[in-house]
Amino acid sequence: MQKEAVRDAANLPSIRSLVRAVGFEGRSLHSINDLTNDQIYALFELARALEPFHRSSVDLLRGSVMVTLFFQPSTRTRMSFETAMHRLGGAVVTEANPLVSSSAAKEESLADTMRTISKYANVIVLRHPDDVAAREGASYSESPVINGGWGDWEHPTQALLDLYTLWRTHGGVEGAKVVVATPDMVHARTGHSMAYGLARLGAEVTLASRSDYRAPEEVIEGLRRVEGAKVREVFDLDQDGFNDLVSEMDLVYLPGCSAPKGEAAEEFKKMMDEYYVRLETLEKVRESEGRIIRVTHTLPRRPGEMDLRIDDTPHQQYFEAIAYSVAIRMALVAAIVGA
C-alpha cells in the first residue's frame, strides 16, 4: 500500500494534466457525437495512463459522488462504472431496480427523479429503455448525465470501450476494416454508436444486416455527414456471403440482438444462422495469410450468435475488452467531474 501511495503521488500531476486536456469538465455524454475526435483521443491517452490503477486506486475524485440509475438490467456497464468511480477515490450510490425500490414505483416522473438525484450527485449514469424519455429526463438534471444505454438509440460508453480496445490492440483505428454485423441493426444501440465512432476516426466500416432491419435513417444520415467517411451497407447475406465478408475484415463487431419470443423465435434463429461467426472462417485466413481477424461482442451473448470455440483463440477480443473497461470509464468520469 505504501508503494502504491508513492506511485499515486508521483503520477497525479501528469494524470491531472491529461484530465484537463480532454476539455470535457461539467459536460454530459448523451451521444458519442458529443465528443470531438480530439477529445476521444485525449480520453484514450488518459485511459492508458490510468490502466495501472484499474485494480488499485488513484486519488483523483475524493469527495465526489456518482449515482448509477438503471431502469434496465446491466452487469458490465453498471459494475465497470461503479468500479471506475471507486478506483478514482469517489463514492457510488446505486439504484439498479428503480421501478421497484425508488419513487419511480410511485409513478414519479423521470424529470423529477433527475431533478432530485442531481442535488446529490456530481455525475449520474442513466440507463433507460426509452431514449426519448431518457433525453428529456436528462435535460432536467443539474449534474452531468452519462448515457449508459438509452432505448434503441445509442450506448456511447460501450462504443468508447470498443474503440479504445481497437486502438490499443490494432495500433490505431484509422484504416482498420470493421464489420458491424447483426440481422437487426434497428435496435443495435451499441452498433449505432460504434459506427459513428469508427467512421469519424477513419476506419472502413461495413454495416451488415437484414434489409428489413437496416440501421435507422437518423444513423445513416449522421454517417453521411461525417467528412471522408468510408461506410457501406450490405444486406441479406447468406452464410457463404457472410463468411467471405468476415474474411476481408480486421475486426468483426457483434452488437448483439434481442431474441423475440413465441412464433417469431424460429425466424429469429434462421436470421442468426446467417450471421453466425465460425472459427473455421477465421482460421482459414490465419493459415493462408498469417492474419488474425479479431472478434468482439458487446455482451451478453446468446446461444447461436457465434462459435464459442473462438473464446480460447487469439481471435477473441470480447473478454480482452472487459479488462480495458474500467480504465476508459475512469478516464471519462474524471474528465467530466474534473480532477
UniProtKB/Swiss-Prot annotation:
Pathway: Purine metabolism
Thermal effects: Thermophile. Is much more active at 60 degrees Celsius than at 30 degrees Celsius.
Enzyme class: transferase
EC numbers on record: 2.1.3.16
GO cellular component: cytosol
UniProt keyword list: Purine metabolism, Transferase
GO MF, any single term: aspartate carbamoyltransferase activity
GO biological process terms held by the UniProt record: amino acid metabolic process; purine nucleobase metabolic process
Reactions the enzyme catalyzes: (S)-2-ureidoglycine + carbamoyl phosphate = allantoate + phosphate + H(+)
Signal peptide (UniProt feature, chain positions): none
Record Pfam families: OTCace (PF00185), OTCace_N (PF02729)
Family statement drawn from the similarity comment of this UniProt entry: Belongs to the aspartate/ornithine carbamoyltransferase superfamily.
Subunit structure: Homodimer.
Protein purpose: Catalyzes the phosphorolysis of allantoate to ureidoglycine and carbamoyl phosphate. Is likely involved in a purine degradation pathway.
Protein name as catalogued: Ureidoglycine carbamoyltransferase
Organism field: Rubrobacter xylanophilus (strain DSM 9941 / JCM 11954 / NBRC 16129 / PRD-1)
